[in-house]
Amino acid sequence: MHVLVLGAGQLARMMSLAGAPLNIQISAYDVTTGDVVHPLTLHLLGHGLEQAIEYVDVITAEFEHIPHDVLAICQASGKFLPSSEAIKAGGDRRLEKALLDHAGVRNANYYVIETREDFNKAIEHVGIPMVLKSALGGYDGKGQWRLKDAAQIETLWQEMAACIAATPTQAIVAEEFVPFQREVSLIGARGKEGQIEVYPLAENIHVNGVLSLSTAIDSPDLQEQAKHMFTAVAETLNYVGVLALEFFDVDGQLLVNEIAPRVHNSGHWTQQGAETCQFENHLRAVCGLPLGSTKLVRETSMINILGEDTLPASVMAMDGCHIHWYGKEKRAGRKMGHINVCGDYSGELQRRLCALANVLDEKAFPAVHEFAKKWQA
């Protein structure tokens, strides 16, 4: 089988690594340059998108922000999975909210803002405090504002109006502020015949809006809620592939915050922690193969490496530590790689995270240090 991935970043790279044992070949389309490249070396493959579409068996995507003309060409080929509808819902908060409502899953009360009058209505409908998010283009905490009191209204409106004016069809989605206890996510896969397999929930810790630490957890009640909502969304979309749902945990009740119609950062722990990783299961699904087991095989946490292109050599010598570099040029705040940390039981994982905190820079890895301080207190 030959799969073309729209996007040539780390997710396409890790799909390629996961596909090799199954004899699934991966090419990647760089939407920025328009080049078709090898996902590991990024070497040009010498042909364009239309040629690639002709010779591959399946087309999929590693991210949501794909030009609609590219999506249309791929969808028309009959080879694209999941559907362009799913990708668009992941890249436009208005469509995402409509999907969640249609699927009947809990999500924060919201109002769409395109004008100042809409903003006034949103304040009446949603109330203060509220969270305001750009409908298009926002990720990792970007394109977001918090309205905490009425004194901010004019200033925030000026910023949001500039955001709306800068991009055609842009809007702002106002959401009620949700006083959640923690953020969790569920990664799951749905096959062509409707088979669904979900991984254990992961608890996520963000720093400045960017995922820093993600740990697989055992929470039967939350797991049941999350699987029910995953199934509702996946079946509403007739989804094929891996899908991620991010939730707020509010006193034991889950609300969907976002969906990601693709393999997801909070599922990287599955590379060492699950029977079958999310990348392999995505390829299995879109290629029409049976889904692999999502069973937890060891306690695992994933630590994002942000803006750093080296680690202390001692990390490689630590038991249970697995480093995954993405081959990117160093840039402040950029996702350069991740570390999966494993233990045979919870206490062993916690001790290994604390050992890592002793050698990793606190400024670069604040979530690991915060975890260690709490665990050792």
Swiss-Prot record:
One of its GO terms (molecular function) is 5-(carboxyamino)imidazole ribonucleotide synthase activity. Keywords: ATP-binding, Ligase, Nucleotide-binding, Purine biosynthesis. Its EC number is 6.3.4.18. Pathway: Purine metabolism; IMP biosynthesis via de novo pathway; 5-amino-1-(5-phospho-D-ribosyl)imidazole-4-carboxylate from 5-amino-1-(5-phospho-D-ribosyl)imidazole (N5-CAIR route): step 1/2. Residues 97-287 form the ATP-grasp domain. ATP binds at residues 93, 133, 138-144, 175-178, 183, 206, 257-258. The keyword ATP-binding applies. One of its GO terms (biological process) is 'de novo' IMP biosynthetic process. SUPFAM superfamilies: Glutathione synthetase ATP-binding domain-like, PreATP-grasp domain, Rudiment single hybrid motif. Pfam families: ATP-grasp, PurK_C, RS_preATP-grasp-like. It comes from the Bacteria. GO terms for cellular component: cytosol. It catalyses: 5-amino-1-(5-phospho-beta-D-ribosyl)imidazole + hydrogencarbonate + ATP = 5-carboxyamino-1-(5-phospho-D-ribosyl)imidazole + ADP + phosphate + 2 H(+). It is an enzyme of class 6 (ligase). Homodimer. Belongs to the PurK/PurT family. NCBIfam families: PRK06019.1-5 (NF004679), purK (TIGR01161). HAMAP family: PurK. Catalyzes the ATP-dependent conversion of 5-aminoimidazole ribonucleotide (AIR) and HCO(3)(-) to N5-carboxyaminoimidazole ribonucleotide (N5-CAIR). This is N5-carboxyaminoimidazole ribonucleotide synthase.
